[in-house]
Amino acid sequence: MVVLQPDPFLSELTSMYERSTEKGSVWVTMKRSSMKCQARLKKMAAKGEAVEYRCLVRATDGKKNICTALSAKEYLKFQASYATVLKAHMHALKKRERKDKKKAAEVEKIPEKAPKKQKKAPSSKKSAGSKS
């Protein structure tokens, strides 16, 4: 996994989104990380120092993995830039219209049926005037 600075990370993320426009996906994960060894964290906590947690941002398109680590101060600037990248590539999130193969086949096979003409039932009236 390649660890990048925030600006190169965003430019690489943009190229990942562009490659996956027609086919594919990009997964982005964010999580809190101390990025320091546990012994060092315990010493800092014992001294009463504030532990600075970093935000770890990872992205992958299934083939290439990139990541960056952000401090709390960098995070707000990064979030604004990241939102701009997402808005620029939202068109890839729209659902594509797909034809259902079964429904299309049924429509082609069954032509529209014309309404059936109803036959008149023979009248049960007897003619009273004719004798033969």
From Swiss-Prot:
Predominant cellular place of this UniProt entry's protein: cytoplasm
Protein name listed in UniProt: Signal recognition particle 14 kDa protein
UniProt record, GO biological process: protein targeting to ER; SRP-dependent cotranslational protein targeting to membrane
A Pfam family that the UniProt record links to this protein: SRP14
Compositionally biased spans, kind Basic and acidic residues: 103-115
GO CC annotations on file: signal recognition particle, endoplasmic reticulum targeting
Signal peptide: none
Taxonomy, superkingdom: Eukaryota
Subcellular location: Cytoplasm
Keywords: Cytoplasm, Ribonucleoprotein, RNA-binding, Signal recognition particle
Gene3D superfamilies the UniProt entry points to: Signal recognition particle alu RNA binding heterodimer, srp9/1
Quaternary structure note: Heterodimer with SRP9; binds RNA as heterodimer. Component of a signal recognition particle (SRP) complex that consists of a 7SL RNA molecule of 300 nucleotides and six protein subunits: SRP72, SRP68, SRP54, SRP19, SRP14 and SRP9.
Compositional bias per record (Basic residues), positions renumbered to this chain: 93-102
Single GO molecular function: 7S RNA binding
Species this chain originates from: Oryza sativa subsp. japonica (Rice)
Region spans: Disordered: 93-132
Homology family: Belongs to the SRP14 family.
Entry function: Component of the signal recognition particle (SRP) complex, a ribonucleoprotein complex that mediates the cotranslational targeting of secretory and membrane proteins to the endoplasmic reticulum (ER). SRP9 together with SRP14 and the Alu portion of the SRP RNA, constitutes the elongation arrest domain of SRP. The complex of SRP9 and SRP14 is required for SRP RNA binding.
